[in-house]
Regions:
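Hydrophobic alpha-helical topogenic segments used for membrane insertion/localization
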Residues: 3-21
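Gly/Pro-enriched, hydrophobic low-complexity segments
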Residues: 177-262
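Short, solvent-exposed aromatic-acidic interface loops
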Residues: 107-114, 130-137, 206-211, 240-247
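N-terminal mature ectodomain segment of secretory-pathway/periplasmic proteins
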Residues: 56-135
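Flexible, processing/modification-adjacent segments and terminal tails
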Residues: 128-183, 214-215
Length: 262
């Protein structure tokens, strides 16, 4: 009987801890403090004349007054990130040297407070991930995946997607095109679908390595759910990522987008 009581008590404590843990994930918390200043206007970037029709239309919809020159971009917001079936609120800062490097600062929140921090960096073809369980540096699969992430995130500074000479667009239909960037394997090519009514990107899909050491790539979806204007450019304010037929594991809610900050 004493053993049963101990077992029951242990189970109650575990259940209580699990309930408390779940409750902590229901409090979103605040995004990062915003004190980065304002975007700097560096003029307009000319739109290439050889883009597919759907891509040209997209460019005119997202930047009706012309594409701004973008050297750096800062994207700040909140997120919902799911790991092993448990969804955490999070906040993030993405720093980009447009088309070249990125730095990700992501914090998972519990009861609104940061409990886990992730740092990710990509530069000179090398990805670095600093996680609570260790570091991953210069892994071939992670390097390849990071390059794809770099360009998928350029949807928040579309001047790079549309004008960088390393980005090669090919028309595949009235409302679709492919995007292959220098350095990517051909099978990593993005398929980009545009909404027939708005002309905006509906989703980008590709094959991407999911884990270090993977021998095969997994179908990767980047889906846009909502668009808003920041700095005269229409970019995704809500977007999500999923693998294959899985439920989305990341949902981003963008609060600020800045270009060419000091």
């Amino acid at each position: 009987m004493n053993l049963l009581k101990i077992a029951g008590g242990t189970l109650s404590v575990a259940a209580g801890a699990a309930g408390l843990g779940w409750l902590g994930t229901q409090i979103e918390g605040h995004g990062f403090d915003f004190s980065a200043g304002a975007s700097r206007d560096l003029g307009k970037a000319p739109l290439p004349s050889d883009l597919p029709e759907a891509v040209t239309h997209y460019a005119k919809v997202v930047a009706p007054e012309g594409l701004p020159v973008v050297e750096t971009a800062l994207i700040i917001g909140k997120a919902k990130l799911t790991f092993n079936g448990l969804t955490f609120p999070a906040r993030f800062k993405f720093h980009h040297d447009a088309g070249n490097t990125y730095y990700h600062h992501i914090q998972l929140l519990w009861f609104g407070l940061p409990v886990l921090t992730v740092h990710e960096r990509y530069r000179d073809g090398v990805a670095e991930m600093a996680l609570p369980v260790g570091e991953i540096v210069n892994n071939p699969q992670v390097n390849a995946a990071a390059l794809m992430g770099l360009w998928a995130e350029a949807i928040w500074f579309p001047t790079t997607l549309l004008t960088d000479p390393r980005a090669h667009w090919t028309e595949t239909g009235d409302h679709s095109a492919t995007l292959l960037v220098d350095g990517m394997a051909e099978e990593e090519m993005f398929t980009v679908r545009f909404d027939p009514e708005s002309g905006l990107i509906r989703d980008l899909t590709s094959l991407r390595y999911k884990q270090p050491g993977d021998q095969h790539r997994t179908l990767w979806f980047n889906e846009v759910l909502k668009w808003e204007m920041f700095n005269g450019v229409r970019v995704p304010s809500i977007a999500q990522i999923r693998w294959g037929n899985d439920a989305p594991w990341a949902k981003w809610q963008v609060q600020h987008v800045l270009y060419n900050t000091d």
